[in-house]
């Protein structure tokens, strides 16, 4: 794998929630003191950083996609379909936010680009390396024809069973310091971008499937609406894709709240019963722990809401995560209504809460594997996600035959220009 180097540079950053629970920039209510001043204190936690300036601005809201289209119409630019087709290989990033995000090999499908059965090719990027809120990758491109373009991605999201992951798209126009400078050059501002183009781009959705998929920029839902964008001929653009919880953030907050309540309920119970309760003893839970009994019923209802959300608003089917919610919901309702069932089911309660905690951890991650992005007009045929039967068979046969000729001893070696004259003995 090629060596990744740090590229220190000045960057503008708007303060966000580092856990990704809130996708919008954080807002602060500031009140000046008697001297009309506001004091801000920054405390270092880890890693060195240089600050040039801090800027306080009024709260900004992103326009909707409909408002974005209206701005394009009012700008005077032609909104005809673009004629160019640009394919950006996922592994060919300009920058990544961390050296953990790097190209990886995939030979599972003949349509993965590029593909070579005789060699190891780092032909995709992402997987579980690109899953933490705030991690980003960047690409640069330009088109040879001004107009509206769809952005398709070939991706695989086979990591979160029955759930989807989200990404935030930001676009930057390179070479123009301001919108006015761009307008002076082109006579309109249609192709100028400086961040999130519209609100829907903050929660682009990639659904679960074991196979490769091809999809345009979409927020998901029943309509699965895509969002064509305007690009100007000859202008260099930067695409910035960032991991975000998106519409999953509210669900994650609810899951964490439920888990905290259930942990408190469990501690309340074992304070009375000990870690190994007697199944035949009357602990008088209703009299001694009425709030705990009530809370278990309340959390049972909340778990039902989580399960319904996963079944209806994700991929529409049950999964291992909905199974955890359904089992825990049934158990909580049983324990909350019948105090005699608490001691008998305490071990199951502990086990289910542990599994639910794993669910919370998984929900915070957003793994995604990218093969390529393709920028093309709406009338151009959509790229295929999977190879047909004959091409797939040919790929598998070729992979099998070439496995006898691959030099596995040289895999991973790189010529850096350095030579070693001495050898060492390893024992």
Task: Give the role of each language-model region.
Residues 1-395:
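Extracytoplasmic
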Residues 71-81, 400-417:
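A short, compositionally biased domain-edge/stem linker segment
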Residues 414-427:
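Short, well-ordered beta-strand elements
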